[in-house]
Amino acid sequence: MTEYALILISTVLVNNFVLVKFLGLCPFMGVSRKVETATGMGLATTFVLTLSSVCSYLVNEYLLAPLGLEYLRTIAFILVIAAVVQFTEMVVHKTSPLLYNVLGIFLPLITTNCAVLGVALLNVQEAHGFIESALYGLGAAVGFSLVLVLFASIRERVAVADVPLPFKGNAIALITAGLMSLGFMGFIGLVK
């Protein structure tokens, strides 16, 4: 049980995929202008990341490894992720058309979010079991969502602040992301 808690804490706070591993930077910068959009994207990514992590584990463990097709891992994982994203897109479209319209092009772009593929590949590399894979995917997704929503709320405040002209736009966003990364470094001592 302690091992499971450590997986969650380490992926959410200590080894955050955005701020430490630099995965998922495209949606991190692209969808973080408004908290509502960031929250929707975070929820969709959480669902996709967790489900694709589990599905990728199953495909690798019961299809690729027994047949000796490990060299097809990346392509197989991309196909699994694309299928999960399509499923998520259909669910969001049916349950929340407003969120579907707000997310726009970013929802299908979850397919190309390198954090999703990174989690699937790191699960294999670290030889996680089924539960560990699910928790690793969930922790990475919660960490991604947490950072995305925090960053969006900071960007909303910075948008109305008196920022010097050379720092407006992406410059202040990157500085803010760097400061957030420094803040998350304070969690390094939690997990050894």
UniProtKB/Swiss-Prot annotation:
Part of a membrane-bound complex that couples electron transfer with translocation of ions across the membrane. The chain crosses the membrane at residues 5-25, 39-59, 65-85, 102-122, 134-154, 171-191. It is an enzyme of class 7 (translocase). It comes from the Bacteria. GO terms for biological process: electron transport chain. This is Ion-translocating oxidoreductase complex subunit A. It is found in: Cell inner membrane. It comes from Thioalkalivibrio sulfidiphilus (strain HL-EbGR7). GO terms for cellular component: plasma membrane. InterPro entries: Ion_transpt_RnfA/RsxA, NqrDE/RnfAE, NqrDE/RnfAE_oxidrdctase. The complex is composed of six subunits: RnfA, RnfB, RnfC, RnfD, RnfE and RnfG. The gene is rnfA. Keywords: Cell inner membrane, Cell membrane, Electron transport, Membrane, Translocase, Transmembrane, Transmembrane helix, Transport. Belongs to the NqrDE/RnfAE family.
